[in-house]
Structure formats: C-alpha cells, structure tokens
Curated annotation (Swiss-Prot):
It comes from Chlorobium chlorochromatii (strain CaD3). It catalyses: cytidine(1402) in 16S rRNA + S-adenosyl-L-methionine = N(4)-methylcytidine(1402) in 16S rRNA + S-adenosyl-L-homocysteine + H(+). It is found in: Cytoplasm. The keyword Transmembrane helix does not apply. GO terms for molecular function: rRNA (cytosine-N4-)-methyltransferase activity. This is Ribosomal RNA small subunit methyltransferase H. S-adenosyl-L-methionine binds at residues 35-37, 60, 87, 113, 120. The gene is rsmH. PANTHER family: 12S RRNA N4-METHYLCYTIDINE METHYLTRANSFERASE (PTHR11265:SF0), S-ADENOSYL-METHYLTRANSFERASE MRAW (PTHR11265). One of its GO terms (cellular component) is cytoplasm. Keywords: Cytoplasm, Methyltransferase, rRNA processing, S-adenosyl-L-methionine, Transferase. The keyword Cytoplasm applies.
Length: 328
C-alpha cells in the first residue's frame, strides 16, 4: 500500500474547487496533510487550462504528512512547493518563498482544512485517538516539546479543568480534572491513551454513547491545548488576509463549534463596512470591509459523501473573498 493510501479522502473537495479556483495564480494549502485537497486543486487548474501559470504552495508541520504529500504530488512537482511549518506562520513562509524565487507574492486562493487527519487518528503512536492504545502525544508537529502526557501529568487541577471546559466544552470538567490529579497522585503519571480512557470510562455513567461523547470532548481539549490550535487559527486567518490579492479567496473547513465560531466571527468582522460615527446618517459607507462573504451559510457534505466518508459529517466550509482596496 502506498503511503498516501492511508490518508483521508478530501472532504468537500468538489465544493472547495468550485468556490476557490477562479483564475490562475498562487494557491496556498495551509493544511497540506497527505495532499488530497492539493491534488484536487491542481487537477482543477489543469482542467481549466490555468496550471501553467499557477503555483500551489503546501504547508504542514507534520513530517509524516509532508512525506505522503510529496509522494502523492510527485507528478506535479513543477507546479508545487511543499514547506514544513506551522500554518500560523503561513504569511512569512509564503513571503520567504516568493522572495527566494523572485515572485510577486499576491495569493489567489488559500485553503485551510482544520483539525486532526484520519491518518493521525489511525496511527496509534501519535496518541490522538482514545480508540487505540498509544503514547499520550497528540503533537501535530512531532518535534514540538509539549505532549499531552506533559500536560496531563504536570498541569494543576484548575488548569486541567479550564482546558477541559474551554477547549472540550465538557460540562463535568472539574470532576474529571479532580479525578486525573487524584489518580496520578496515587498511581503515578499517565503514559498511554488507554490509561486516560479507562479513567473516563470509570467516571462516566449513561452507557457507551455517553462515554464516547466524554472521551471525544476530553481528547479534543487536550489536542487543542497541546497544539495551541485556536491561537494558531487566529494567526493564520490574519496571515491569509494579508497574503490574498484583491478578489483572492479564503476557504476554511472546520469540524467543531470552537473552530467554526472563530472563522465565522473573523469573516463577519472583516466584512463590516465603516458607516462613520453613530448618529450620522450616510447613504453609503465611508469604506467597505476587507472581505465579502461568499457562503452566507456554511457548505455541508451531502448524504452520499457522508456515507462514503464519515469524517465529512461534521465539516463546515466557509468561503470569503478579499475586496479590492478602495474608498467608496
């Protein structure tokens, strides 16, 4: 089996292509993964006769993902550049590449597919899933210093409760945090996902469905905290807005309410026009917003796609276009 066969099918690929590929230029896949969305973008550019004057830049902090993407996109090498880095640094990474190659750094489209990949979930050694026994790791960048084990074994009860509540929206955050601290004091440090999952199972009543919901919230919270996912998301959205040229588009796919809330607020905030001081009636705004929202409501996967790829069930795709800078 080829490396890329173990990676996920691209979620909402047709919708991404239809909303993002409008013309030739520089396209940035800020969450390259195994390269499945990048491949769909390259194929669309080729089909529309836009490939020869286009470049796709893929960014990922996961070395395994970069290796898989390089294999998948090998035939497209003249039109691709693959970079290792956190997408929060996307603006500087892309600018450095453009400077090195003597390119004008005006980006036509940016894609962000948020969250953990199927490959990462399915690889026990990465420690992302409660369904597989592995080390408590959860790092997107496996060279980063902070692991889930460091967090779960050294954070105090108040900090753990905060993480479980704010990043997992876990209603029993305090009780779970207290139980974690009590167990590590009695039995020593947690080392595996299985040990943490076993504790949650003992504390959760209401059957397997309730257990799975609690485990999902807890593991999500730890993953977000380990990788500072929400902080990185705020930064990459600002970076994407900076990179885009006039009419360039930003497509963001989220998988849980915390991510989607950040994206929705960012789009709404930057789409607002300046109507001047309150109490002054104007027929037209003083200036337009930086963005125009393309998808008034998020695009969702069809029933057919969800049947083929259950990961698509929770996906929400939001797209916005950068306005040409001008004063109205």
């Amino acid at each position: 089996m080829a490396l890329h066969d173990t990676y996920h099918d691209p979620v909402l690929a047709a919708e991404v292509v239809a909303t993002l590929v409008q013309r030739s230029g520089i396209y940035v896949d800020g969450t390259l993964g195994g390269g499945s969305h990048s491949l769909a973008l390259l194929q669309a550019l080729q089909a529309q006769g836009l490939l020869e004057s286009s470049l796709l830049i893929g960014i990922d902090q996961d070395s395994d993902a970069l290796a898989m993407a390089a294999e998948r996109l090998q035939a497209w090498q003249p039109y691709t550049r693959l970079l290792k880095g956190n997408f929060r640094d996307m603006a500087s990474l892309v600018q450095q590449l453009c400077d090195a190659e003597g390119r004008a750094c005006a980006v036509t489209g940016v894609l962000l597919d948020l969250g953990v990949s199927s490959f990462q979930l399915d690889t026990a050694e990465r420690g992302f899933s409660y369904m597989r026994s592995g080390p408590l790791d959860m790092r997107m960048d496996n060279t980063a210093p902070l692991t889930a084990a460091e967090l779960i074994n050294h954070a105090d009860e108040a900090e753990l409760a905060r993480i479980f509540y704010h990043y997992g929206e876990e209603p029993r955050s305090r009780a779970l945090a207290r139980a974690v601290v009590q167990q590590r004091e009695k039995m020593g440090n947690f080392t595996t996902t299985e040990e943490l999952a076993a504790l949650v199972r003992r504390l959760t009543h209401g059957g397997e469905k309730a257990v799975i919901k609690t485990l999902s919230r807890l593991f999500q919270a730890l993953r977000i905290a380990v990788n500072d996912e929400l902080g990185a998301l705020h930064e990459v959205l600002e970076g994407a807005l900076e990179l885009l040229d006039g009419n360039g588009r930003l497509a963001v796919m989220s998988y849980h309410s915390l991510e989607d809330r950040v994206v929705k607020h960012f789009f709404t905030h930057h789409a607002q026009c300046d109507w001047g001081p309150k109490g002054v009636a104007l027929r037209e705004p003083l200036s337009q917003g930086a963005l125009t929202i393309v998808t008034k409501r998020p695009m969702l996967a069809s029933a057919d796609e969800i049947e083929r790829n259950p990961r698509a069930r929770s996906a929400k795709l939001r797209v916005a276009a950068k306005n040409q800078p001008k004063t109205i």
